[in-house]
Amino acid sequence: MHRYRSHTCAALRKSDVGATVRLSGWVHRVRDHGGVLFIDLRDHYGITQVVADPDSPAFKLAETVRGEWVIRIDGVVKARADETVNKAMQTGEIELYAQEIEILAVAKELPLPVFGEPDYPEDVRLKYRFIDLRRETLHKNIVKRTQIISSMRNGMSELGFAEYTTPILTASSPEGARDFLVPSRIHEGQFFALPQAPQQYKQLLMVAGFDRYFQIAPCFRDEDPRADRLPGEFYQLDVEMSFVTQEDVWTTMEPMMTKVFEQFAEGKPVTKQWPRIPYDEAIRKYGSDKPDLRNPIVMQAVTEHFADSGFKIFASMIAANPKVEVWAIPVKHTEATGAIGRAVCDRMNAWAQSTGQPGLGYIFWKEEDGKVAGSGPLAKNIGEERTAAIAAQLGLGAGDACFFVAGDPAKFYKFAGEARTRAGEELNLIDRDRFEMCWIVDFPFYEWSEEEKKIDFAHNPFSMPQGGLEAFDSQDPLTLKAYQYDAVCNGFEIASGSIRNQSPELMVKAFEKVGLSQTDVEERFGGLYRAFQYGAPPHGGCAFGIDRVVMLLVGAKNLREISLFPMNQQAQDLLMGAPAPATPTQLRELALRVVPTPKKD
């Protein structure tokens, strides 16, 4: 028999009854039932119940074992009595009668519990992550993550893509976030950067003629922590293809990712045909370029119904500024919600005020004496005819309600989108048991930066502008669209991509609009710029955020619940104690000196 085990703790079945076996694992818990000891023995694969009674030669030692000790047990497989069968366990029809126990390792008093998985301070969990990872839910999440990545790899290989690895030590590249810099010992005063994405390398692979590339790529961004992003390091399914249009990218990746979702969705419906929604339409209908399509609320403009109306706040705004619009957030009642009345409207208004807004106008409709009429301050101010016209446009009736936002849409659309989401959550309209996918397409190429008072790239600076050189020379830059697209699932951006700009001339023109000269382009993107002068094929691709995809599929509440050794929200690795000061010797070798930041008065 093997030194440590003949079977795993998930392997034994009723067909093994009578066999003498050997198991090794962690003591999950110990129970004493009237002098008979029950030990749940756990390993990576599952749990087996071990029994030791006073007649067992292993009983004396069994009495000493404690939770999370590592032990080896030899014993005989026995069938459980019918009334003690546990159908929730893979090994629930059998138990192991202990004959010999060997203690392989003892455990100190635990800093956090493994059994039962109660809530525990996150910093303790991260400091003792090796114990935290023994918890069933987290352990399953990590195993599921591995399976999902494996499924992605298989899917890409079946589509004829080859996996190539690109450098981790590279040049600094302005891609929207700060770089992590690595000082060079050999080249004093110079620095490598960890890649924010393999963007330039994968494009260079297309120029080199490799046609279909993918990689499970680690990416590094020195960003301030956010709830929907892991600080420091994250992973993406990085993809690039030659001689393709954006439609080719969509029709290649959409079925593959749908298949991955269906494989791990545990029966929840997954969108089979992902709708293509133009960016402008997404902003108008959902107030977001990451719309949660499980929410049935679709916004509409109702400006005409408030122009010259009795509601002077909106009417005066419309008269004073041609950019002003009034958007409606219509909410239809369901059997589950019942009629939507003043109480819901008041809660929504209070929520809006809590976010710093002056409030949220509303109308709710009810039936009185056989007639449907609008109620609330807005309905009273604009009158019966305009209220009825709004209801007719939006398809609203008795029991329904509508919220209103007014101003310059460029300034209020995000709040309108948040109000749409809040209304959907308030009335429980969002179906949590499905995965709703879409592509957001036709992104703006440029945007106006209020902070810097200049034009900047809206997204990926390497995207191909729609219309090419001709559009560049004839259009207002802020009206240019890019061959750029995002994939969205349940309100989360899960992928971003574009058709790339492979023209050196157009590349220089694109960067000139944001204030970078040809010399700047050659200095910052020299490798790519040079490559494009030696025959670059039309190419494009995308990158799916693996961490977010896994988080959605396992239903985790944050990204740290699907990552092995994540940093905390202060970008610290509490387990390894990183970041940490360098030693004087290390600093001397790198010709570096730490200069403390002056303290502010």
Curated annotation (Swiss-Prot):
> Where does the UniProt annotation locate this protein?
Cytoplasm
An MF annotation (GO) of this entry: ATP binding
Q: Give me the residues that bind L-aspartate, please.
A: 175, 221, 459, 500
Give the range the annotation lists for the signal sequence. Answer: none
What is the reaction catalyzed?
Answer: tRNA(Asx) + L-aspartate + ATP = L-aspartyl-tRNA(Asx) + AMP + diphosphate
| EC id | 6.1.1.23
Region of interest (Aspartate), residue spans: 199-202
Task: Name the PROSITE patterns for this protein.
Answer: AA_TRNA_LIGASE_II
**Gene Ontology CC entries for this record:** cytoplasm
Gene Ontology annotations of biological process type: aspartyl-tRNA aminoacylation
What does the protein in this record do?
Aspartyl-tRNA synthetase with relaxed tRNA specificity since it is able to aspartylate not only its cognate tRNA(Asp) but also tRNA(Asn). Reaction proceeds in two steps: L-aspartate is first activated by ATP to form Asp-AMP and then transferred to the acceptor end of tRNA(Asp/Asn).
Q: Which family does it belong to?
A: Belongs to the class-II aminoacyl-tRNA synthetase family. Type 1 subfamily.
Name the record gives this protein: Aspartate--tRNA(Asp/Asn) ligase
Q: Which organism is it from?
A: Allorhizobium ampelinum (strain ATCC BAA-846 / DSM 112012 / S4)
